[in-house]
C-alpha cells in the first residue's frame, strides 16, 4: 500500500521534475520565462519591459473585489519573483542550469539557497571597513604608547629636573606668583605637571615603538604609498650595491649604523630606542665590520657566562640539574 502511494506521488511530480521545475525554488512549478512572456534569448531590457507591463496589469490596487484583488496579488508576486530571478545574471544562470539539468535535484537546492543565504554586502566594502577600523585602532594605540612614554619620562628625576630647569621662568611667572591671582596648591601641582609634560614633549626625541604617531604610519596610508615604498626599497639596495660593493666607497655614519643594526638583528624602531651612549660605543668598536662584531659578540657571551656562573640562583639551578636532571612527565603524574 505504501509502495503504491509513493508511486502516485512520484507520478504527480514527474511532469514538473521532467521540466526542471521544483516547488519552493524560483517560480515554483511555473516557468519564470513563461510568467513574463519572454524567452531564454530575451535581453535584459526586454525582460524589464515585460515586467513593467505585467506589473501594471496585475497591481492589486487596480482590481476591485476581494477575490480579484487576491488573484491579482498572487500573480503580481509571481511576476515580481520571476523578474528578480531573470534580471540578475548569476541567478538567471543558475535558473537556466536547473532547466537544462532537471536530474541534479540536490544541486538546484544548494545553488538556490546558497545565493539566498549568502551576504549581499560587497566584498570591497568589507575590505575598506576592515582597513579603516585597523587604521583607527593602530593610530589610537600609537597615541596611547606615546602618552605612556611621556608620563614615564616625567617621573624620571633626570628628565624631570631638566624640564624644571628649562621652564624655570615660566614656573615662577605662573605658579609662584602672589596676591589675589595666586593659585591653590592643587592648581599649582596640576600646572606644574602640565608644564613639565609640555617641555618633555618639545625637547624629548622619543623614538622606536613609543614615538609620536603620524598618519604616515597607519595601514591605510602605508597601502596607498606601497608602490613608492617598494620602488624606494629597490633603488636603495641598487645604490648600496653600486656604491659599496662595486665602487668600494667608504661607509658614512648612517651606513655604519645600518650594518650594525643588521648584525644585531634589530628592527629600526628597536635600534633607535637604544641609548645614544651605547650606539656611540658600537661605532667606537667598529661593529659594522663583520669580524669585529663576531669577536665582540663572543666576548659578550663569555661575560654573560661568567655573570651566570657567579649568580647564586644560577648555581643552585645547576646543582639541581646535576643531581636530579631535567623534569619528566609520566602517565602516573
UniProtKB/Swiss-Prot annotation:
Q: Which residues form a coiled coil?
A: 158-208
Q: Which residues cross the membrane?
A: 8-28, 123-143, 218-238
**Which PROSITE patterns does the entry mention?**
DNAJ_1 (PS00636), DNAJ_2 (PS50076)
- Is Secreted there in the keyword field? no
Domain J span(s) in chain numbering: 31-99
Membrane topology annotation:
Multi-pass membrane protein
Record-linked Pfam families: DnaJ
Where it sits in the cell: the answer is: Membrane
Q: For this UniProt entry, what is the primary localization, expressed as one broad class?
A: membrane
Query: What GO terms describe the biological role, i.e. biological process, of this protein?
Result: protein folding
GO CC annotations? endomembrane system; endoplasmic reticulum membrane
Q: Which InterPro entries match?
A: DnaJ_domain, DnaJ_domain_CS, DNAJC25-like, J_dom_sf
Instruction: Cite the entry's keywords alphabetically.
Output: Chaperone, Coiled coil, Membrane, Transmembrane, Transmembrane helix
What family, per the record?
A: Belongs to the DNAJC25 family.
Q: Which PANTHER family match?
A: DNAJ HOMOLOG SUBFAMILY C MEMBER 25 (PTHR44176:SF1)
Q: What is this protein called?
A: DnaJ homolog subfamily C member 25 homolog
Protein's organism? Drosophila melanogaster (Fruit fly)
Amino acid at each position: 500500500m505504501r509502495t503504491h502511494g509513493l508511486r502516485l506521488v512520484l507520478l504527480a511530480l514527474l511532469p514538473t521534475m521532467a521540466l526542471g521545475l521544483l516547488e519552493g525554488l524560483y517560480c515554483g512549478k511555473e516557468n519564470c520565462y513563461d510568467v513574463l512572456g519572454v524567452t531564454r534569448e530575451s535581453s535584459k531590457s526586454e525582460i524589464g519591459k515585460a515586467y513593467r507591463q505585467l506589473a501594471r496589469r496585475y497591481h492589486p490596487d487596480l482590481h476591485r473585489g476581494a477575490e480579484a484583488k487576491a488573484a491579482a496579488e498572487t500573480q503580481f508576486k509571481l511576476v515580481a519573483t520571476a523578474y528578480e530571478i531573470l534580471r540578475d545574471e548569476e541567478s538567471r544562470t543558475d535558473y537556466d542550469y536547473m532547466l537544462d539539468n532537471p536530474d541534479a535535484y540536490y544541486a538546484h537546492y544548494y545553488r538556490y539557497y546558497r545565493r539566498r543565504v549568502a551576504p549581499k554586502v560587497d566584498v570591497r566594502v568589507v575590505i575598506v571597513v576592515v582597513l579603516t577600523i585597523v587604521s583607527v585602532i593602530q593610530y589610537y594605540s600609537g597615541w596611547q604608547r606615546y602618552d605612556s612614554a611621556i608620563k614615564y619620562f616625567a617621573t624620571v628625576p633626570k628628565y624631570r629636573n631638566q624640564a624644571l630647569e628649562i621652564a624655570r621662568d615660566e614656573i615662577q611667572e605662573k605658579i609662584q606668583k602672589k596676591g589675589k591671582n595666586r593659585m591653590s596648591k592643587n592648581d599649582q601641582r596640576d600646572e606644574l605637571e602640565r608644564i613639565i609634560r609640555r617641555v618633555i614633549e618639545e625637547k624629548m626625541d622619543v623614538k622606536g615603538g613609543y614615538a609620536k604617531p603620524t598618519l604616515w604610519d597607519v595601514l591605510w596610508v602605508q597601502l596607498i604609498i606601497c608602490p613608492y615604498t617598494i620602488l624606494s626599497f629597490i633603488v636603495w639596495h641598487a645604490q648600496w650595491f653600486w656604491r659599496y660593493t662595486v665602487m668600494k666607497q667608504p661607509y658614512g655614519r648612517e651606513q655604519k649604523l645600518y650594518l650594525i643594526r643588521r648584525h644585531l638583528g634589530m628592527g629600526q624602531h628597536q635600534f633607535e630606542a637604544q641609548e645614544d651612549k651605547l650606539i656611540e660605543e658600537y661605532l667606537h668598536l667598529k661593529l659594522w665590520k663583520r669580524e669585529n662584531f663576531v669577536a665582540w659578540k663572543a666576548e659578550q657571551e663569555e661575560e654573560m657566562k661568567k655573570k651566570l656562573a657567579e649568580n647564586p640562583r644560577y648555581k643552585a639551578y645547576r646543582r639541581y640539574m646535576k643531581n636530579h636532571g631535567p623534569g619528566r612527565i609520566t602517565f602516573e603524574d
